[in-house]
Swiss-Prot record:
Protein name: Effector protein BipC
Family designation: Belongs to the SctB/SipC family.
Organism listed in the record: Burkholderia pseudomallei (strain 1106a)
Region of interest (Disordered), residue spans: 62-91, 338-402
This protein's UniProt keywords: Secreted, Virulence
Length: 419
């Protein structure tokens, strides 16, 4: 047992006084209860004698300066506060086990230091229980002689509590910094996901514009080829079919003349000739037989010679018309191919755009997952920091309570000494 006088620098250590005090706790049963009062009385007497002698000597030495005030150091708490101390530290230990891995090493060391100071107490209790089983008479004396330390009754323990609070504050700052980083990561992931959305929209717009332009171009080219095909057919009808029809009509008329049908006859004014205009524009004059029964031999010979040439021209008009139809068909096919090629190109552009959009969506999913992971990590970090702050607050509250208890005990002892 130690008593320190802080203002005067007195530090008194009395082993006999400790043995007298501890002797009152070594007895059991009714005898322990009876002897407890005598032991406490002897302890008070010894305490008063020792303090009186040392204080009187000190008072004589400083009588000239008028210093009469004596301050006592904080004594150890009694058995009631020890149970409170143990419960408090047990709570700190449980909180320490529940803390996340985000704690700084200094905070963990402070918790371990506080818990370690009470491990010796638990070991002493266990040794006491085993000693009772082995020898009922020797165990109480061994337990009384064994040193017992309580964290909240030691000045170093209070320093540890204060260091714990400071370390927890630093840990809070570290948690805030980490939460800020995680929030920035989540923000960056969100911005990247938004950029992927814009990229998908741009890819869709590009595909739509390119596909539309290609399809419009090929459709226009195909329409122009189809127009050429129709124009070729129209030209063939105008230049080939119409002349062919006129030649066929003239050829039929000449054939009728050769057969004597609708042959020319003399009119009332007795015209002796007739003029025939050929398809070349040349006008040929033929004499008419005054008998009116048949054509002249010269007329029939001319008509017979011109018939094969007219038939050849009729056949050539038909062949050229067929060639024009073939040309128009090729133009029509080219137009259809252009339109089909435009549709195929548009489908290819849509496929490439869909592939790019799929890749962008995959990256977007990755960014969203990264954002969710960062937010979950930030939430976990915040929860761990909250638990750390709660544990630190409990430790600080326990230290404050212990200080108040020690002050009350010191005031009571000082009052007893004055009386």
């Amino acid at each position: 047992m130690s008593i320190g006088v802080q203002s005067s620098g007195i530090n008194i250590s009395h082993a006999g006084l400790s043995r007298l005090v501890d002797a009152g706790k070594s007895e059991q049963g009714d005898k322990a209860v009876r002897d407890d009062g005598r032991a406490l009385a002897r302890a008070d007497a010894a305490l008063a004698a020792v303090v009186g002698e040392r204080v009187a000597a000190r008072r004589d030495a400083v009588a000239g300066s008028g210093a009469q005030r004596v301050e006592l150091a904080r004594p150890k708490p009694d058995a009631q506060t020890r149970a409170t101390d143990r419960r408090t530290v047990s709570g700190l230990e449980r909180e320490h086990k529940r803390l996340a891995a985000s704690q700084t090493p200094r905070v963990t060391g402070m918790h371990d230091a506080l818990v370690q100071r009470h491990v010796s107490l638990d070991g002493a209790k266990a040794a006491h229980g085993e000693g009772v089983k082995r020898a009922a008479g020797d165990a109480p004396r061994a337990a009384a002689d064994a040193p017992q330390r309580f964290a909240f009754a030691d000045d170093k323990a209070f320093d540890a509590m204060l260091a714990l609070g400071a370390a927890m504050q630093k840990n809070v700052q570290s948690d805030l910094a980490m939460q800020g980083k995680l929030t920035m990561l989540a923000h960056d992931a969100m911005m990247s996901a938004a950029a992927q959305d814009r990229s998908i929209g741009a890819a869709q717009m590009t595909a739509a514009i390119a596909g539309g332009a290609l399809q419009a171009t090929t459709s226009l080219g195909g329409a122009m080829q189809q127009m050429k095909s129709l124009s070729t057919k129209s030209m063939s009808i105008e230049k080939e079919l119409k002349p062919q029809a006129e030649l066929k009509q003239f050829h039929a008329e000449q054939a009728l003349e050769l057969r004597g049908i609708n042959k020319p006859v003399l009119s009332n004014d007795e015209v002796s000739h007739v003029k025939i205009k050929r398809d070349t524009g040349e006008t040929v004059r033929h004499e008419i037989d005054h008998g009116g029964e048949r054509m002249s031999d010269e007329h029939a010979s001319v008509l017979a010679q011109e018939a094969p040439a007219r038939q050849h021209r009729i056949d050539m008009h038909g062949m050229r018309h067929e060639e024009n139809l073939v040309k128009a068909g090729r133009q029509q096919m080219k137009g259809d191919l252009l339109q089909s090629g435009g549709q195929i190109g548009k489908n290819q552009i849509d496929g490439a755009s869909a592939q790019q959009q799929g890749a962008d969506r995959a990256e977007q999913k990755e960014d969203e997952n990264a954002q969710q992971t960062a937010m979950a990590a930030a939430s976990t970090r915040d929860e761990a920091a909250h638990r750390s702050r709660e544990a630190a607050q409990k430790a600080i509250d326990a230290a404050k309570s212990q200080v108040a208890n020690d002050n009350a005990v010191a005031a009571q002892v000082a009052g007893n000494l004055r009386t």
